[in-house]
A protein has these predicted regions:
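Noncatalytic interaction/regulatory regions of large eukaryotic proteins
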Residues: 1-668
Length: 668
């Protein structure tokens, strides 16, 4: 006796490039059997953008419960081989009764397919854990998918001692589903273009001011920075709220290699207070760029550049301002490594602060930005694609936050971080330093570093009223953590379910094996542990990236505030430094302009910008998912309103962690 007939409709997504000339073959797979492939694109049925192609499938024997739809594209002779974006396949079993079998089953696809992909199997039904799969065929389908992904997506060592990356040599190897992000056109810095070939030093501050006036006239934050960059209170503000708010930390003990005494610093502390008392009160903060110690500096325009590894002490005064009170430019103390103080001559002290900013730029670019956000996103993406099947709830939650990172990072390694790229030809640390910095920094990153509440508490930033990054980061963390906790609880009905999930633990093992190891969980025991770990990943790929990326140009536009390279060595003695001396330390004109134009491009959101906790993927239209999204989006709107109200009262607003400005992923 033959099986029931099925009415099938194949839905092509509506985008203008979603169609294909290829033929489509379709099979239905049930718990008891499957149909042979039938060609969908016959006669008048074509896979046009937004089209619906109907086909009737007659099963020769009973299929049982319908569980999978198998699709395969075949290139049509003499026609271009175009990728096809399938929205979904809907199947209706034709039967006399009107029971559950008569309902339409929806098999979501929502991705690009290619003839080279071979057979692609679509599932019907909700996301679930492996132990909840009833059908053996669905368990096998999960396994097949992971085996295929592990052959396709492999690990590669980029730098020894740092998180590994995806093993591809070109963007085309990633396939269309990992290439969808598009760069926005950068703001046109027209007046910088003509300077990118001028291989000479800046002549004066007035020359810098001329370029700045023409190029940054619409940038209110950059103009504020230029007006206040020499002031000590602003130096402290930038440590808290600039493009690199990850370096500063409270210290209760002076580093043994910092040559300061209580008497030396007494003039810069409140009357009657000693350095020891201020340390114990938690009023002393430290910037320590030890990671730069001893690394080779770049050669740019055939000129040797120089790096320092400064230590900088800052004091939290009674007005809530964080003021620098001592700067030592190298790690090893000695007579040729003086401690600069606010009481030194104006240009001596200014130059010392510029050296700190230059060191901070190197650490910002490679560590706070590339390592902490880009490499973290890629690590999570590769592990997710390799170890969590599509049907796993954490695969669907995480992928929108990480999948763009592969295209961005592969492109960066082929351009910005490649030989003769921007880092090689314009940045003081250069390519030779890159592996040293990444491996050193990776060894220092702990799990607590990635968890915002612990990180801010450990660094003493959660108590500072002027730390707007810290305030906003905690708000964002709490909202995302609440959302992720609800998502985890939706699918893990108890802690025992977490412990029994082999796919989850293979994923965690992959991250630990190819990523960080300092204090990271080796196994999950509770739902709370899973939610915290996933929140840390999502925060790193979204909010942290927004804070360290989209702020770059604002704080670097005024070149002396953020020297990307230094052309003279750090001073070995205190002396009368002049304005001309200051200018001679700055990078050449072409170097400066090339970096500013690159930062300008990096500061633009993607064309297809998706705000934090907004999702275009069809799976998020499920009723249960939609309710969770409504809750978190309402929380984020309230945070946006609170930040807008606060910023309206500030002379220099902090906008970077306002949720509507946070991209859901590393997409630039």
């Amino acid at each position: 006796i033959g099986g029931s007939p099925f009415e099938v409709t194949v839905h092509t997504s509506p985008g203008p490039t979603c169609g294909t000339f290829s033929h489509l073959w379709l099979s239905l797979i049930g718990s008891e059997g499957e149909t042979p492939p039938i060609r969908v694109t016959d006669g008048n049925s074509h896979l046009l953008p937004g089209s619906v192609c109907p086909v009737r499938v007659q099963a020769s024997s009973p299929l049982g419960r319908l569980i999978l739809v198998r699709l395969r594209l075949e290139v049509q002779t003499r026609f271009p081989n175009l990728d096809w974006h399938c929205s979904r396949v809907e199947v209706w079993r034709v039967s006399k009764g009107q029971g559950s079998d008569s309902e339409t089953q929806v098999f979501l696809c929502d991705r690009w397919l290619r003839p080279a992909d071979g057979d692609v199997e679509l599932r019907s039904g909700k996301l679930c854990l492996l132990e909840e799969e009833i059908e053996e065929k669905l368990k096998q389908q999960r396994l097949r998918q992971l085996q295929h992904q592990q052959q396709l997506i492999r690990w590669r060592i980029f730098v020894g001692g740092a998180p590994q990356c995806v093993d591809v040599n070109s963007l085309s190897e990633l396939g269309p589903n990992l290439l969808y992000t598009q760069k926005s056109p950068a703001t046109n810095l027209y007046y910088l273009n003509g300077f990118t070939t001028r291989v000479e030093s800046w002549k004066s501050f007035s020359e810098l001011e001329m370029i700045f006036t023409y190029s940054a006239q619409q940038n209110d934050i950059a103009r504020f920075v230029k007006a206040h960059w020499m002031e000590d209170w602003y130096f402290g503000y930038q440590c808290l709220n600039g493009s690199n708010p990850l370096m500063l930390r409270e210290t209760r003990h002076l580093p043994p290699n910092l040559s300061v005494t209580s008497d030396m610093l007494r003039p810069f502390l409140p009357e009657g207070c000693s350095l020891e008392n201020e340390l114990q009160k938690g009023n002393i903060y430290l910037l320590d760029y030890e990671v730069l110690d001893g690394v080779p500096a770049n050669v740019i325009n055939e000129k040797q550049t120089y790096l320092s590894a400064p230590l900088c002490l800052l004091h939290l005064n009674q007005q809530g301002q964080l003021l620098p009170i001592a700067i030592q430019l190298q790690q090893k103390p000695g007579p040729q490594n003086p401690v600069f103080l606010p009481s030194d001559s104006g240009y001596d002290w200014l130059l010392a602060k510029m050296w700190v900013h230059s060191a901070d730029f190197q650490c910002h670019q490679l560590i706070s930005h590339y390592l902490r956000t880009h490499m973290m996103a890629e690590l999570c993406c590769v592990a997710t694609l390799r170890q969590l099947p599509d049907a796993h709830p954490l695969h669907q939650l995480l992928l929108p936050h990480v999948k763009t990172s592969l295209k961005i990072n592969v492109g960066a390694r082929a351009s910005l971080l490649a030989s003769k790229g921007l880092f090689d030809q314009a940045v003081g640390s250069g390519l030779e330093t890159l592996p040293v910095l990444l491996s050193r920094a990776s060894a220092k990153i702990s799990y607590r570093t990635l968890c915002v509440p612990e990180d801010l508490s450990d660094r003493g930033l959660d108590k500072l009223p002027q730390s707007f990054y810290a305030q906003d980061a905690l708000r964002i963390w709490d909202a995302v953590h609440s959302f992720v906790t609800s998502w985890v609880d939706l699918y893990y009905h108890g802690d025992d379910a977490v412990q029994r999930d082999p796919e989850l633990h293979c994923w965690l093992t992959d991250i630990n094996t190819h990523g960080f190891s300092n204090g990271f969980p080796q196994r999950f025991h509770t739902r709370a542990e899973v939610a915290k770990f996933v929140t840390a990943l999502i925060y790193s790929c979204s909010a942290l990236h927004a804070a360290v990326n989209f702020s770059q140009l604002d704080f670097a536009f005024w070149v002396p505030n953020c020297p990307v390279a230094m052309l003279r060595p750090p001073p070995q003695a205190k002396c009368a430094v002049t304005e001309d001396d200051i200018m001679s330390f700055l990078p050449d004109v072409n170097t400066t302009c090339r970096v500013l134009m690159a930062l300008n491009g990096l500061s633009q959101p993607a064309i297809n910008f998706v705000p934090l906790c907004h999702y275009k993927e069809a799976i998020f239209r499920d009723d249960a998912h939609r309710r969770l999204l409504e809750e978190v989006q309402a929380q984020l709107r309230a945070i946006s309103d609170a930040i807008a109200e606060r910023n309206s009262q500030l002379e220099l607003p902090y906008p970077y962690l306002s949720p509507e400005r946070i991209e859901n992923s590393v997409a630039i």
